[in-house]
Amino acid sequence: MKTTKLLIPTQKEAPNDAKIISHQLMIRAGLISKLALGLYSYLPIGIRVLQKVENIIRQEMNKSGAQEVLMPIVQPAELWKESGRWNKYGAELLRFIDRHQREFCLGPTHEEVITHLARQYLRSYKQLPMNFYQIQTKFRDEIRPRFGVIRMREFIMKDAYSFHIDEASLQETYEVMYKTYCNIFNRLGLNYRIVLADSGSIGGNTSHEFHVLADSGEDTICFSDKSDYAANIEKVTFFKQEKTCQSTMVESKVLTKEKTSIEDVSKFLNVKKVNCVKILIIKIKDGFKALALRGDHELNEIKIHNLFGDFEFSTNNEIKNLGLKKGFIGIKNLDIDLIVDYSASVLCDFVCGANECDYHLIGVNWQGIKFIDADLRNAVDGDYSPDGKGKLMIKRGIEVGHIFQLGTKYSSVMKANVIGESGKAVTTTMGCYGIGVTRIIAAFIEQNHDDKGIIFSQAIAPFQIVIVPINYNKSTRVKALADRLYQQFIKASIDVLLDDRKEHVGIMFADSELLGIPHRIVISDTHADNGSVEYKARNKTNKIEVKFDDALSFIQTKMI
């Protein structure tokens, strides 16, 4: 490809709404163009990268034995009502009515459609297991699209769905897909972690997420510094601890006028937040509950949902009607059940509210207090790993893949049955496996860039090498050598870009670096005199003189 035949709308500055580096560089390098909030067009350079990502995914999925299909993005409401998700999914599901007054939606995912296909065509246990995948557009009406292609409304996803006669078969395919995802992300050159995860609105039991480590990530992940343990922060489980402290203080009440936050109270009383207990009041189906946590810990809402089902934080009026004072709630004289986090239940001589406006208690202990202890909190950096090996490190991550063991969540309600070996109908067991295709590019850039631009790997770079001929349109010798080398690369199946523009060499260099092309060859009249070319790798600073006749073989060694 020659640059004069290619749209490369590079920019010196990124738009003001581009807050993270991947968004800035994808705009500046001309990979994408914003159409509306959460909607982006992929330009020719971006398409080249996108297709290479898709090809790697497709190759590994095919190698795993999965079969490619393509399902409509427009889905009839009947399927979603049948699964029970039509009303549960929320505002992210874009619903519409066609000219015949029939209800449809734009698919944010395809569990219903694939289950419908399975019940049409899978009849016998002899056909199982069967794994289908597609690379298809999705639409989720995100309330707050941001970070460029990381959180879009319309995006491309690889989603796969497997069908099995039993849990044992599902486990086998799940392990195959786990390894397949590792192969994909390894080939893409991503620094990632695999974590235990919550299944969210998709449903199911066992679930793993694949996170690319990046400071701009929206997710918080935890992993041990001494073992392979890793989990989404919402999934880290803690266990009951042995109490090791002994009380040495006499409980007393102190004036803490207008000090309603743990931060303010700990500073005012000159105690660490770890020695404070905070109380949260929640409303559940059958009443109210008081939740007690250590002052330096945060509530894990998923754990609370798992304990009590749907819940809400109580309003100021509800707290007042319970006879409590917001900001001064304590553990004593409560008329509602008290649930105490494991880490708070082993404290001695702690600070908590006095259930009286402008007062707190110090030197408080649990003796005589009726409560139930449970795991209520999120992990923090330095916590002991749940597997007993090492301590937890907490990092930000961008989720690029998620695999689920769905079980019979969809197949049972949609009657995706097969005839089993006994001759009786058996409900199929399902797995679900997703990769955010468009998100991968941004995640890669977050990990691979410098002040000059993107640093693509050979696997997904728009071009493997760029030839920059100085005075290409003035020097016949330079043009002849550049054209000759260009043809050699093409014949060797090397993805090459020849910069044949009438531009200053500085602009040509800047564009090639911004685009992240891994290898660069420079040819000038001086090089023509010497029978050589200049080579530079995008991720290196040094330049190498290479004999012109050796240039092809030299580059081929770099491609290995």
Curated annotation (Swiss-Prot):
Keywords: Aminoacyl-tRNA synthetase, ATP-binding, Cytoplasm, Ligase, Nucleotide-binding, Protein biosynthesis. PROSITE patterns: AA_TRNA_LIGASE_II. It catalyses: tRNA(Pro) + L-proline + ATP = L-prolyl-tRNA(Pro) + AMP + diphosphate. GO terms for cellular component: cytosol. It is an enzyme of class 6 (ligase). It is found in: Cytoplasm. CDD domains: ProRS-INS, ProRS_anticodon_short, ProRS_core_prok. Its EC number is 6.1.1.15. Homodimer. Catalyzes the attachment of proline to tRNA(Pro) in a two-step reaction: proline is first activated by ATP to form Pro-AMP and then transferred to the acceptor end of tRNA(Pro). As ProRS can inadvertently accommodate and process non-cognate amino acids such as alanine and cysteine, to avoid such errors it has two additional distinct editing activities against alanine. One activity is designated as 'pretransfer' editing and involves the tRNA(Pro)-independent hydrolysis of activated Ala-AMP. This is Proline--tRNA ligase. The lineage of its organism: Bacteria, Pseudomonadati, Pseudomonadota, Gammaproteobacteria, Candidatus Pseudothioglobaceae. The gene is proS.
